[in-house]
Amino acid sequence: MIWLRRVINLYNLVRTGWLLRGIPPSQAETVAQHTFLVAFTSLMISRDVISKGLSVDLGKVLSMALVHDIPEAVEGDIVKWVKDRVRGDVNKLDLEALSELGLNDLKDLMLELNSEGSVEALIVKICDNLATYIQGRVYYELGFKEVNDILEGSLSSINEYVRKLPKGYNEIVKNIVNKVIRSLS
């Protein structure tokens, strides 16, 4: 089990974007904490979509949510600014990192997620940004106003991914996300 010791390190790997905006390391969210919130919001949104009669593979959603940042056990936390500029290279690195961790069987899942090739992948992408937004709001309310650009960027990304969802899904997910965001006010 090559992956076990490396993946456990995600409990201690602080998300760099928060540090760059003045969040003290002792208060900064870790990759594992972020992953939990991504998985939980993915679960809740998927259940709501399913309850409206639309199809979502809940197992795939949860698997993608749990795996989406596993490569960071090898790569470290790569900030969005860098990812946006070297997207294709980061996607290749993600696959190499999974190999190094002995998790080759998760490569297809990562490819689908990174290509945004399904409703499930888009839900996880939305929830990845929603989890970042939720944590950013916590920091903002604690007085860390420097996180505002992350809040704005997360909302912009959420809206972009919602627009990519098929008709029917997009309105349901948009309404759920808006309820979550309003509940933070």
Label every model-predicted segment:
Residues M1-S185:
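Alpha-helical, largely C-terminal catalytic domains
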